[in-house]
Swiss-Prot record:
It comes from Vesicomyosocius okutanii subsp. Calyptogena okutanii (strain HA). This is Large ribosomal subunit protein uL6. GO terms for cellular component: cytosolic large ribosomal subunit. GO terms for biological process: cytoplasmic translation. This protein binds to the 23S rRNA, and is important in its secondary structure. It is located near the subunit interface in the base of the L7/L12 stalk, and near the tRNA binding site of the peptidyltransferase center. The keyword rRNA-binding applies. The gene is rplF. Pfam families: Ribosomal_L6. It comes from the Bacteria. Belongs to the universal ribosomal protein uL6 family.
Amino acid sequence: MSRVAKSSITIPTSVEVIITGNLMSVKGRLGQLNMSIHPCVAIMNTNSKLSFDIITIEKKEQRKAWAQAGTARANTANLIQGVTEGWKKKLTLIGVGYRAKVMGKILDLTLGFSHPINYKFPEGIIVETPSQTEIIIKGMDKQKVGQVASEIRSYRPPEPYKGKGVRYIDEQVIHKETKKK
């Protein structure tokens, strides 16, 4: 039995959860998110608490079913936080001449290449640049926010000798020692 699926989720008063068949819809002050539910997972909504269980299946499939129930519970908690508070990732640019600026729906990155990089971010994502070397990515969908942050980081990941590149604000880069004669 999944330890994650055992714990129930308390639904805040500002959030509305609608379950129809294998689709869950979560509405909050920031918007609405949808998620499909695995057929072996049963979700009960009682007294503004969501509890997760599995639909009785064969003994050999129960382990996978509980894993799906735990995943559904974690994803539901992420949806609820997304529609109430939202998700945020911060990136920092380290290197001489590395800078970023937002122009409408395009993030313009100068990362030491011979050309600037224009990254068009998807719908539902807000990108801010409080300074030239800081990027803040906000949105309701945790997966989308993480994906956008990962794509921006992949243009120039931090290198291990000087640490130059795009990194998450809390990321620790392990430095290598240079070759000695």
